[in-house]
């Protein structure tokens, strides 16, 4: 029996090693631009880094103990979680005990809004947001309205920025929460979260910001911007999918999300996803180590593509702010061209772009973000989003520009 178990164990290890060998061969091909695809949808998700996978592997195969157990084998799993928590906290300038692990950005947004409102119900029932938030925020607030909460939706200007004056004017004694995203997932516009935080603090209102698109792209030092709650998602910064975190400033009133065990300081029960937590912690370290270099590199690539497209293709409009914009985001309207048809033509050339948020790409309605900017429905339907990342190369953008020129010309002839 023991011999059979040993043989089975070795066979399992051999299979795992074969899988990893194949995975890393594919990964190296992608990293060396040998992939058949030009991937320009980094706002939807990012490829997991090789170093992240290597960090995660032992927690699938060898170090599998439940971190809630008290024996030494389990303490190693708990220590790994603590290390990841500390690594993430360092990137934001906060305390490790203020970081709570979740299943991703959507859960973090839901928890921040629903459970702070629940904890603050005796103070008031008014929440302020903007019209261009991610649907994880907007749909949650729609539910809040259905159960008696009042929500103010701030307009944005043509670049996608809120008015600080309108924000301050919207605050009243019943206001308990402001939730404004750090940077928009469709147009890349960065909101003035430092000023928003100061306004919220002056009025004694909690401030939550959805940092899913911004984290890893711009420096964020939470103590300086008076943020009480901050959401992020691992797969947006080269970590695994299905894992995220919520920063909750110490002493911020918030109710527990899940009932059960004592995990996450009794606020989110359930056995931790150790491997993914470890992977996200590693990804957070890596992306912040290279952030300054990547911001410059990606900004140059972004500006190169925008300049060439605007110069070489007629009737093109850039959406969002050029100055206050994420370094990897390009959102373009090609007048007289259906965005979905353009996406399909680019896909036939193995170029991956988006018509908007990946979370809503199957919906037939125009982008609520673009409509809030003042675009017509026709213009909104004529828009694509290109987002670049660490593996994007200038040669890929050159090929994309040529494909865009040909595709747009062909589609305009047919319209």
Task: Report the location of each language-model feature.
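Pyridoxal 5′-phosphate
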Residues: 17, 21-415
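N-terminal, intrinsically disordered, basic low-complexity segments enriched in Arg/Pro/Ser/Thr
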Residues: 11-14
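Extreme N-terminal basic, low-complexity initiation segments
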Residues: 2-8
């Amino acid at each position: 029996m023991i011999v059979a178990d040993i043989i089975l164990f070795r066979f399992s290890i051999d299979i795992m090693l074969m899988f990893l060998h194949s995975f890393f061969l594919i990964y190296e091909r992608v990293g060396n631009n040998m992939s058949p695809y030009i991937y320009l949808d980094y706002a939807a998700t990012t490829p997991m880094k090789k170093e992240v996978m290597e960090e995660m592997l032992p927690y699938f195969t060898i170090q599998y103990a439940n971190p809630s157990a008290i024996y030494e084998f389990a303490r190693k799993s708990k220590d790994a979680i603590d290390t990841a928590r500390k690594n993430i906290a360092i990137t934001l300038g906060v305390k490790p005990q203020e970081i709570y692990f979740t299943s991703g950005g959507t859960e973090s947004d839901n928890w921040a809004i629903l459970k702070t409102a629940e904890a603050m119900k005796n103070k008031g029932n008014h929440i302020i947001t903007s019209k261009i938030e991610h649907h994880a925020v907007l749909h949650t607030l729609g539910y809040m309205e259905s159960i008696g909460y009042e929500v103010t939706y701030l307009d944005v200007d043509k670049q996608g920025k809120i008015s600080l004056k309108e924000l301050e004017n919207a605050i009243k004694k019943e206001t308990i929460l402001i939730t404004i995203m750090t940077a928009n997932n469709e147009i890349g516009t960065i909101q003035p979260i430092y000023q928003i935080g100061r306004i919220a603090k002056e009025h004694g209102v909690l401030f939550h910001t959805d940092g899913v698109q911004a984290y890893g792209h711009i420096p964020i030092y939470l103590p300086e911007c008076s943020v009480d709650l901050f959401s992020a998602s691992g797969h947006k910064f080269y970590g695994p999918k299905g894992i995220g975190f919520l920063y909750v400033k110490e002493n911020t009133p918030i109710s527990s999300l899940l009932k059960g065990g004592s995990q996450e300081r009794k606020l989110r029960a359930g056995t931790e996803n150790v491997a993914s937590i470890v992977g996200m912690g590693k990804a957070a370290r890596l992306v912040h180590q290279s952030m300054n270099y990547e911001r410059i590199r990606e900004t140059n690539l972004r500006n190169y593509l925008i300049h060439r497209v605007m110069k070489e293709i007629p009737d093109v409009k850039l959406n969002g702010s050029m100055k206050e914009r994420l370094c990897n985001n390009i959102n373009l309207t090609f007048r007289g061209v259906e965005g979905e048809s353009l996406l399909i033509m680019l896909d036939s050339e193995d170029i991956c772009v988006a018509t908007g948020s990946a979370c809503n790409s199957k919906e037939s309605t125009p982008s609520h973000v673009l409509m809030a900017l003042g675009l017509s429905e026709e213009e909104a339907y004529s828009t694509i989003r290109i987002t670049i990342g660490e593996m994007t190369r200038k040669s890929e953008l050159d090929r994309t520009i040529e494909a865009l020129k040909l595709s747009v010309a062909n589609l305009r002839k047919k319209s």
